[in-house]
Amino acid sequence: MFLELIAVAVAGFAGAGGIMALRLATGGALPRWLIPVGAGLAMLAATISSEYAWFSRTSQALPEGLEVASSVSSTAFYRPWTYVVPLTDRFVAVDTGNLRPNEQDGLYMADLYFFGRWRPVRSVQMMIDCPAGRRADPALGDGSDPVWRDVGPDDPIVRTVCEGV
């Protein structure tokens, strides 16, 4: 986060410097108020670029065995450009290298990692029933059965786990 702040500040100085160089090249024909406008536009462009690059940068840095199962794109009124190209701001990764089979065929315990922009990574264990296309949080250890959700074989998490075995 700190490095992104530094990058935005550097972009602002570069934008202002570019406008100052244009003013010098045109003999002062451009108005002086364009200098802070150039700085602001450069800072905005750096911020937007960083926001859009987060998903690809983070997903490419995942360790071997972690596969992206699903991503969520969003729009916001305070980011009007997201209505043109939605911004991916969170995703779920499955640790396919560490799937644990159950005694019952087709049942697997998987570790899921939830990544979000400006949020800490959360991990959850989930049971996946590949033949039935359903998933459940594991039982709490109190002897109760897990609550299964029928999500179908096309569910991104079920598909990623079942293809990973």
Model-predicted regions and their roles:
Residues A14, L34-S49:
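Hydrophobic membrane-insertion alpha-helices, especially the h-region
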Residues I19, R23, G27, A46, ...:
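Membrane-water interface at transmembrane helix exits
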Residues Y52-S73:
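Alpha-helical transmembrane signal-anchor/signal-peptide segments
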